[in-house]
Amino acid sequence: MTYFVIFLGICFMLGVLAVASNPSPYYGVVGLVVASVMGCGWLVSLGVSFVSLALFLVYLGGMLVVFVYSVSLAADPYPEAWGDWRVVGYGLGFVLVVWMGVVLGGLVDFWKVGVVTVDGGGVSFARLDFSGVAVFYSCGVGLFLVAGWGLLLALFVVLELVRGLSRGAIRAV
């Protein structure tokens, strides 16, 4: 199980690398999906399945909408791929920064550190996050409505900010 969690962490970092060095929004979507799937799989292996599901829905529901608007508003005639030298340089720079953080942080011996998973704590720790579901839907209703309204308002503000001189992003169909 520890090797699986380390595999998920490495794949998560590769997804973050793909998002950080995205040459165009077309390829950034792929990195975002990989990072969100691996990160949520990591959370499931740690025993927080409801939070993982909520984050997965937020990432794929919210962030992919942002990437769709980015792709539609910034349509490149010749999008750069991950094989271009500039993008490879961004990726290598990101890997260098992460590696220096690992070396300077003293985390080089990460295989000697135990990972607390569902197997380590038993079945009683598998559903600790379900106790927060009642709080989400009882005390948090007002906050969810305010947050949803704020996100909708932010979407329209961004669409108005990026509109052109003659035709905006919000137009009659």
Swiss-Prot record:
Residue intervals passing through the bilayer: 1-21, 27-47, 48-68, 87-107, 139-159
Family the entry assigns: Belongs to the complex I subunit 6 family.
Any GO BP: mitochondrial electron transport, NADH to ubiquinone
Entry's Gene Ontology molecular function annotations: NADH dehydrogenase (ubiquinone) activity
Main location: mitochondrion
EC class of the enzyme, as a word: translocase
InterPro entries: ComplexI_Subunit6, NADH_UbQ/plastoQ_OxRdtase_su6, Nuo/plastoQ_OxRdtase_6_NuoJ
UniProt EC number: 7.1.1.2
Complexes and interactors: Core subunit of respiratory chain NADH dehydrogenase (Complex I) which is composed of 45 different subunits.
Pfam families the record matches: Oxidored_q3 (PF00499)
Glycoprotein as UniProt keyword: no
Record's keyword terms, sorted: Electron transport, Membrane, Mitochondrion, Mitochondrion inner membrane, NAD, Respiratory chain, Translocase, Transmembrane, Transmembrane helix, Transport, Ubiquinone
Membrane topology listed for this record: Multi-pass membrane protein
Role of this protein: Core subunit of the mitochondrial membrane respiratory chain NADH dehydrogenase (Complex I) which catalyzes electron transfer from NADH through the respiratory chain, using ubiquinone as an electron acceptor. Essential for the catalytic activity and assembly of complex I.
GO cellular component terms attached to this protein's record: mitochondrial inner membrane; mitochondrion; respiratory chain complex I
Location(s), subcellular: Mitochondrion inner membrane
Protein name per the record: NADH-ubiquinone oxidoreductase chain 6
Catalysis performed (reactions): a ubiquinone + NADH + 5 H(+)(in) = a ubiquinol + NAD(+) + 4 H(+)(out)
